[in-house]
Amino acid sequence: MDPGPGLAALQAWAAKSPAYGAANQTVVDKVPPDMMHMIDPHWYQFPPMNPLWHALLGFTIGVLGFVSISGNGMVIYIFMSTKSLKTPSNLLVVNLAFSDFLMMCAMSPAMVVNCYYETWVWGPFACELYACAGSLFGCASIWTMTMIAFDRYNVIVKGIAAKPMTSNGALLRILGIWVFSLAWTLLPFFGWNRYVPEGNMTACGTDYLSKSWVSRSYILIYSVFVYFLPLLLIIYSYFFIVQAVAAHEKAMREQAKKMNVASLRSSEAANTSAECKLAKVALMTISLWFMAWTPYLVINYTGVFESAPISPLATIWGSLFAKANAVYNPIVYGISHPKYQAALYAKFPSLQCQSAPEDAGSVASGTTAVSEEKPAA
């Protein structure tokens, strides 16, 4: 049976590497000599990966990079060029898109080239910069999402008593996010852990296989401040957000029964509904972020505690899921943000395949308007 040109091409790719399937060959054989000092002895026990995995990873990362760079670039352009979207709350959305945009600009092209050569080809210092960039932008993304959750908590739970976030307040939060993220990601350059090639040899990350507990402590403490603490803060925010929304809806239904009407919805209630919609969007985005980064955390903890063997193939999935995070945010906000859609279709009519959403259904801009009308505390 003829395998077809596509399968034949993949088989030819797999056959071109004499190392794959050969005896006494390891996954580190193609690593350049100037990087051998960075390779942990753990990886010498594994044979070369099937070139098909490198091809699949390179293709997937290339697609994710294209979608993320174009999608996040579009989000940044639309939000910054549309007057009605230039609100304090949306500055956090822009910062999130900016972080994801830079992540894929820094990581996707380099990894595609590495997958073609089936090893890291950019040298030791570029490996460290690559890993530092992934850590920096990942940290910035999760803390930006945490600030978005706090903003929703302030508007929805505290209501009219809340002090609205100003542009200066949003910019100060963004500055704090980047300073905090940069501080954590620079520490490995000063001896607390280090950045090394991962098991697939096409990406770089933190050294979670080190036997030194000083080095291991970086992984553990970093995960507390960049994974578990934001998670707890976000859960706290959304617990009270859901509680407040449920109480509001219950009060509305009870009042409607007393007045013998179907609904008490008014323009003010519509604004509250918009707040609830944005809370759902943010919660979805955050859930996708944790789905993306949890596999990488599990791999790091598995290495630190030596609870199970880690294969080069397993490290591929950690890299893939982590980078997929940069694709989720523009999709989520583009689908569920009517005012963003309206601005997008106005600037790029060719993208419109259905009638433009009504501007009155705005989510993010509507919530900001509610906030800005409140008196300062």
UniProtKB/Swiss-Prot annotation:
- Give me the disulphide-bonded residues: 127-204
Q: Name one Pfam family in it.
A: 7tm_1
Is Cell membrane a UniProt keyword of this protein?
yes
Region of interest (Disordered), residue spans:
357-377
Which SUPFAM superfamilies does the entry mention? Family A G protein-coupled receptor-like (SSF81321)
Instruction: Enumerate the subcellular locations listed in this protein's record, separating them with semicolons.
Output: Cell projection, Rhabdomere membrane
Q: State what protein this is by name.
A: Opsin-1
Q: Which organism is it from?
A: Manduca sexta (Tobacco hawkmoth)
Organism ancestry = Eukaryota, Metazoa, Ecdysozoa, Arthropoda, Hexapoda
